[in-house]
Amino acid sequence: MRHLLYATRQTYETAILIKEAALLPSEIERNYIDPITISGYSKENLIVFTLDYQPNNKAPVGHCKAYLLGQLLPALKKLGTKFIYCADSNYFKVLTKNTKAEAQLGYVLPCAIDGYTDMKVILGVNYQALTYNPNQADKLNLSIGTLTSQLSGQYKALGSDIIKWASYPKTEAEIEKAFAEIMTWDEIAVDTETFSLHPLKAGLGTIAFSKDITGGFGFQCDLIQQEGENVRIFNTMFRHRLRKFFEEYNGKVIWHRAAYDLKVMIYNLYMADPLDNAGLLEGLEVFTKNLDDTLLIAYLATNSTAGNELGLKTLAHEFAGHWAKDDISNILAIPLPELLQYNVVDTMSTMYVKNKYYPIMVRDGQKRIYQEQFLPSLKTIIQIELSGLPLIPDKVKEARKELENGMFAAIQLMRGTKFVKAAERVIQQRAMEAANAKLKTKQHPIEHFSHMQLNPGSNQQVAILLYEVMKLPIIERTKTKQPSAAADTIDKLIYHAKTQESKALLQALIDYNKVAKILSSFIPAFEAAFDKGNGRAYLHGNFNLGGTLSGRLSSSDPNLQNLPSGSKFGKLVKKCFAAPHGWIFAGADFNALEDRINALLTQDPNKIKVFTDGYDPHSMRTYAYWPEKFKHLPNTVEGINRIQEEFKTERSDSKPVSFALQYLGTWMTLVKNCGFSPEESKRIEDNFHKLYEVSGKWVKGKIEQATKDGYGTGAFGLRIRTPLLAKSVLGSSKTLREAEAEGRSLGNAISGQSYGLLTNRAVNEFMQRVWASKFRNDIIPVALIHDAIYVLIRNNPAAVKFANDNLIECMAWKGLPEIADPRVPLPANLDLYWPNWATPITLENNLSEDEIKQAVTAALEARKAA
């Protein structure tokens, strides 16, 4: 237990606790002692102690308790310590018996350990965290401010006095008077409390409005109190008044995570039923005419390789504190006055977040992308998420049954191998030893454990199979340094298998993992889809703006970006999706968008050749990686493209190589992911960099520029902050490993990934055309997955032609200077999925209505003949 003193005395009123690795006197003084003493507190009252960690750099609860009770707390008691600044979340949670440390930042808590409850504990921040994430500086300053306010006797709990005024109108007259006042405000923050996270089940419990950070109005809607309990009702009068207000109000309306609240508002105030697209569009126009979304503002102000937190409570914590003990999951269980106050604090906090982050967004040049890309995308996404993806419930049942059969078959195949039988003997032996270790005399024989079989879902048991029995190399480890048995690790290990039996076993494990993922992540969501009474149930997932570093959409509930595709499992899942009667499910996917964008950005001649000269890209790379194998082939388009048919194995082997190296992997990645020897891996990496020398220099230059600027720039000017690169000299022996990883993340984002925003831009322009056309209720967007746009089109040749002409034209847009080179276009084709998503009919561009009919007829006849 090491310590630092600033005077020799009998007592020290305040102790700072920190990991031993951070006990650097100059840094302790700069980050803690100096800021504390500036407030007038004498540093002679301060002492710094180290916190003990295990050799593996872990501090589990038991270890923390033993160190605190055995050494540290008795020492602090003897020194008369009253205040503890604990710059370690693990120890803080033990000291205060809190399960979540972050929420307690800015608060003074009593020590919860018996015998030491007279001590006060403040959660601190380890200054070393600032190296990896400069945003932690705000939290460090907040924690120091909390300590100094406590030491000076001026401490007030965060959020305890932020409400300067609040009003909760109940009568019709009070409600009218309140709305009349709100109507005079130039801008308002609005927030709802609802009964469910599902937009079609949420209802409107309460709603609040604020014009600034001092207070606001809170209104009951579909929630009343009867005999002391909350009761859900349908408040027609208030809903009518609410709709009237939003139609008449012309000021700025500010939401946090508007995609959710606006879905709820539109569905409840405008849609007569779940299929009412006309009502949806009417409400969409009202609610998107003049809005801000503080989640998007905060994202653009903080987007960084260090990550960011975009929840309202986190962003406004320094203002409002931990104003709700937990996220509200059931508003019926919360006293109505408390719920209304909570709702008002939400709107005040929304205003606080805008006031803090909007100027940063503008300063960093992100206002244009916010207004021209993110807000239009928000409007489109609201219609997408309210419309949903149509599913056939009976097909979902069939898929579950087939998947369960596939899982059973994979398990049976595994259990028939010598490797699994050997692994089961190890599992049984260890179970016997563990059981017998608890017994004093009687011992269980191994036969008592013969029923135990390998559980493919147990990482611990699969690790025994992979590494102890099959003797496969350990290519990845878990956070606890154990050999990894994760699904993506097994995907790589198959390249290290030496025999057909071991490869077959690993393939069965891969199949098992894929099926298990579908059964756990997708099928339950499909089964819970919303039945709209037209023969289809609809999947209402989330497409999240601001969910990735590159600006591309993420997806959740479920993550549709992870839908299996291109395999037997992908086809099985896609059979579940089909349009309702009278409609066509359709989609258009950019053709190799990321590869085309990379060629355009880098102007690498060997990447551009693929699109100008007709090279098969996989054959070109195969030829470059293993030139010794193809000396007999002429170095021409025709010669190299022969690899596509004549050397399918080598071409297939090139794909994981290309994937690894295109995303800035190294020869070591190839050893791990592909099973090549170090020597071969080095040759392949060298050949890759020779092939793509120009693009390699381009990416390197962008990363080096980020070390000077502290950020890189993606599509449409998206800023990607790189705090570690800003402090690093790349390529030196002292370069942080994390800085190199940050460089890879930046390189991947700016060299292609961020241009996934072109998908957003295309669908936004397309929907503007649809909304302005006679087809506004005949073409409905339903999903954005990777670089593909999915829509429902009424079964009408004119509507199909409109989509085929306009969507493809919008996707072909190349209005950014860096991608304007006409040699590499951005093509796409419209697919009509009939009878379901698994069976596309691809249309050529610019077909007439008659040609569309002929193309569909020909495709269906070809299927019959096949």
Predicted regions and their residues:
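A polyanion-binding, active-site-adjacent surface
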Residues: 1-157
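Short hydrophobic beta-strand that contains or immediately precedes a catalytic carboxylate
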Residues: 16-18, 124, 188-190, 291-292, ...
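Acidic beta-strand-to-loop metal/phosphate-binding motif
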Residues: 82-89, 189, 251-261, 585-587
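Active-site-proximal helix-loop-helix substrate-binding element of RNase H-like nuclease domains
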Residues: 119-120, 128-133, 141, 151-170, ...
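Conserved "right-hand" nucleotidyltransferase catalytic core of DNA-directed polymerases
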Residues: 149-227, 275, 307, 319, ...
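Conserved catalytic core of nucleic-acid polymerases
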Residues: 379-386, 407, 439, 540, ...
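A common structural junction motif
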Residues: 692, 807-819
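Short hydrophobic/aromatic beta-strand micro-patches
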Residues: 790-794
